[in-house]
Amino acid sequence: MLGEFQEQIQRRRDLNEASRRLAGLLGEHGFAPQGGTSLFQWVVSMRAHALRDHLARQGILVRLFETPGSLRFGLPPDEKGWERLEHGLRTFNQMESLR
């Protein structure tokens, strides 16, 4: 029983660390979160629709909210997911800078 409790504590720590990593990654690419939990980060952006569409074309699903225009990003499932998200954010910003 004590082992299960310690596992729960470690899992919470891991989720909190992953959430901070997600917030940092989003912020590095110009999408600083306005809120979140240990499971997701919420970003308000005038470019929410365009970013959602760009990420969806790469198989990265985020939740779009209309008012205010915002996105909810869940934690990537594994390291490959983190890499895909970083690539998606980077290529979106590159594409936007060409406009």
Label each region the model flagged.
Residues N16, G24-Q58, L75:
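Conserved PLP-binding catalytic core of the aspartate aminotransferase-like
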Residues Q8-R12, R52, W82:
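Internal amphipathic alpha-helical segments of the cytochrome P450 catalytic fold
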Residues G3, M46, P77-K80:
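Short coil/turn linker and secondary-structure boundary residues
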Residues E4, T37, E66:
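Short, histidine-centered active-site or binding-site loop motifs used for metal coordination
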Residues H54-Q58, L64-R99:
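PLP-dependent enzyme catalytic core of the Aspartate aminotransferase-like
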Residues S19, A48, W82-L85:
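A general structural signal for well-ordered alpha-helical segments in protein cores
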